[in-house]
UniProtKB/Swiss-Prot annotation:
This is RUN domain-containing protein 3B. The modification Phosphoserine is found at residues 232-233. Keywords: Coiled coil, Methylation, Phosphoprotein. It comes from Homo sapiens. Belongs to the RUNDC3 family. Disulfide bonds: none annotated. Residues 317-342 form a coiled coil. The modification Omega-N-methylarginine is found at residue 13. Isoform 2 is expressed at high levels in brain, thymus, ovary, testis, leukocyte, liver, small intestine and prostate. Isoform 1 is expressed in the brain, testis and adrenal gland. It is activated in tumorigenic breast cancer cell lines and in the primary tumor of breast cancer patients. Activation also correlates with metastatic lymph node invasion and can be detected in metastatic epithelial cells from the lymph nodes and in the bone marrow of patients. Interacts with RAP2A. Residues 8-21 have a biased composition (Gly residues). It comes from the Eukaryota. PANTHER family: RUN DOMAIN-CONTAINING 3 PROTEIN RUNDC3 (PTHR46251), RUN DOMAIN-CONTAINING PROTEIN 3B (PTHR46251:SF1). Residues 1-24, 399-428 are annotated as: Disordered.
Amino acid sequence: MASRSLGGLSGIRGGGGGGGKKSLSARNAAVERRNLITVCRFSVKTLIDRSCFETIDDSSPEFNNFAAILEQILSHRLKEISQSCRWLAHLQIPLQGQVTWFGYESPRSFWDYIRVACRKVSQNCICSIENMENVSSSRAKGRAWIRVALMEKHLSEYISTALRDFKTTRRFYEDGAIVLGEEANMLAGMLLGLNAIDFSFCLKGEGLDGSFPAVIDYTPYLKYIQSSDSISSDEEELRTLGSSGSESSTPENVGPPFLMDENSWFNKCKRVKQKYQLTLEQKGYLEELLRLRENQLSESVSQNKILLQRIEDSDLAHKLEKEQLEYIIVELQDQLTVLKNNDLRSRQELTAHLTNQWPSPGALDVNAVALDTLLYRKHNKQWYEKSYQSLDQLSAEVSLSQTSLDPGQSQEGDGKQDTLNVMSEGKEDTPSLLGLCGSLTSVASYKSLTSLKSNDYLASPTTEMTSPGLTPS
């Protein structure tokens, strides 16, 4: 910048007046850009400081000043509509105002640039602002967009997206604009701090009226510093002004300025005292708040200790209960194993007992058969006697009937009866002769004898046999 100024001055000295004007305009533009960015940074800082004490809304002077500064930045060196209306018509973007042969009647606003460059932002509010009924002018829509973006905490995102679309930015702005220079990156970074503030705006207020331009109040950001040389020069000027009225100047003539200085010092002292009292009150409030927070912290710490102790006790109780349950499980498993072994042993003993108690038929020897036969005789002796008596009676009846029918054969019958008695007296009492207990003339007795011989029947000692030949026919 300094080189450009020096170049401009040399051009002026050499007779080049056109180069000097260009360098001067460039320097003025640079100063304007730097001032706007600096004021915007101060405005953002004051907004953040104010948000710590109250909610930021339309009535806040800090916000109104910030909105005016941002509007001035976005409108800095904005091209006229007539220069780019053909390109916008090619993109099928609706424009505000009426078209004439010379361009648009209404002036260009930064909203025309924002709604084109920020359409790529996800979930943008462009369509919502376009459809607002109470906002008609392009400038009013731009102001509404600033408020909505601040409430959504997306203003920095909108500006960053618009600045990345360099082609669109070049079409809307002239050379030397803030959005085309290095200051644009600083602007996006400054606006990022506004995402921490909660804004509350009414989109139907007078602030959206686009009939008047935005005016920046630089007063809060100005600071006057008076040097020692300027103070002495002011006193000399006061003496000169006091002596101009009369030739004989006395110290009384300079009295009123000193009185004014005393009043000013008194006012300064009064303001300092007020600030001190205010600071003292704030200090007392902060100390009280600190004590309250310390009490809350101590209570929280004590409660935390109690809860930690409860958790430790619960963990210990759970561990003990777990150990007891594991011990019970092991004991039950041992008991189950013992019961299974006892059951298996009982089954084996029962099987062995049953096997010894009831041997297989092939394992029986001759002595066992004889013992079985003796036991059978003992238990069935009475039955044998009854059978023999019935056999004798039956034989007598048969012989009588034959004698009565054939007297010639009676003698033969007597002989047969004697033979039968002899045989009955000399027979062997064994189970093999049980089939002969019936009548020899009975067919059923003969069949039972045949079946007995064929099966080698051996009666059990505990079984009572009923021969079909013993039943009288």
